[in-house]
Amino acid sequence: MPSELAELVEFLHHGNSQIRQIACENLLGFSISQPSLFKVHQLLPVRDLKLLVRDYTPIAKNALTILINLSGDEEVLKELAEDDAFLETLLSKVTVIISNSPPLPTGTAQQNKKEPHVNEITMLLTNLAKSDSFKRIINLTRSVPKDVSGSPKALDQLMDCFIKGQDGGINKAADSNYDYLAYVFADLSKYDEGRAYFLTRQEYDSVIPITKLTVFTEHRSHIRRKGVASTLKNIAFEVQAHPQLLAESGVNILPYLLLPVAGPEEFTDEESAAMLPDLQFLPPDKERDSDKDIIATHLETLLLLTTTREGRELMRAVNVYPIIRECHLHVDDEGTREGCDRLVQVLMRDEEGEANGGEDAALAKAKAEFEKGAADEDEQIVEVF
């Protein structure tokens, strides 16, 4: 059997497309159970698979799926993530209208269609973003895909795909929705350059990128909600940006963090009167986010935003406490309750005599706690079974 599998791997670069297709189909399951098969001859099978991403549709789909599964391996990840030409292949397929097949003979009509494997490509980009080398995409420029974006910046183009492509808005093929790009943004926001991008108004559309993402904290897609929640938390580590994040004329982040945490509970008129308008008189069928981890992430972001005295005073002024109190009472999860407790302790404490130096200590403590949890998230690789 091992010799037969080795022979099958050799067929990945066979000149006959039918043989390449059969090889991909039969090797797919082994990309999880026996990934070492693809690491022979200095990763030659991986290099073959990179080329097959541009092959006929059924071959390309299986090649992408195999690469998704293999990219959890550090050596394979390095091979994929550091390849500029391969990154451009993925970007051009995910951002523009292209042909899904190799060119037909001269004189043969060929109908261009939308890329049918958007979901697989964005899953692969999600895994590539685990590599530090992938952050070069933050400053990468390329040709403008006019059907999708008006910017030459690759990250702007991915943002536009994410915004316009939800629910098949750009690409109806195979229910393409670009949801997995939320995880790409979350990984990029861990870098200083990434946070700077999300907080800087972009020239091509005069919009601050993070304001495009906040609206997805209550989206029906769990992937979007989770990725955006992590992105917002990472952005909140930029303490100097807290005034911009909190201001109604800026990002106005508070409602987007509090709404997923809020449930259908009723508050007294006195409590409601001081709350943000979006949090007042919520309907009786209002539901909290169904994922306790996402709620915990929003609580961590809120805690980070209490690093400055101005942030704490704003949260007190808009009566955040009752919302957190009800979350503590109604979410049956120890981690969520601990997050509520930490936030309430900060909001309810006496500010008298507090020195500004305490803010640095609070941020350092928060970073230590959150980065410990983030280390586990970093190891999570998307796999397709």
What are these regions (language model features)?
Residues M1-L51, Y56, V251, P260-P264, ...:
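N-terminal "cap/leader" segments of large eukaryotic alpha-helical scaffolds
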Residues M1-R47, A60-K61, L70-T89, I97, ...:
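Elongated alpha-helical scaffolds that mediate protein-protein interactions in large eukaryotic proteins
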Residues E7-V9, P45-L52, T89-V94, A154-F162, ...:
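Buried hydrophobic core positions in alpha-solenoid tandem helical repeats
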Residues F11-G15, L52-Y56, V94-I98, A109-N112, ...:
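Alpha-solenoid helical repeat architecture
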Residues Q18-I22, P58-A60, S101-P103, K113-H117, ...:
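Positions within the helices of HEAT/ARM-like alpha-solenoid repeats
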Residues L27-I32, A63-G72, I121-S133, L181-D192, ...:
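Hydrophobic residues within the alpha-helices of tandem HEAT/HEAT-like
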Residues V94-K114, K153-S176, V261-D293:
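Acidic, Ser/Thr- and Gly/Pro-rich intrinsically disordered linkers and low-complexity segments
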Residues R201, K212, H219, I223, ...:
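Structured C-terminal portions of repeat-based eukaryotic scaffold domains
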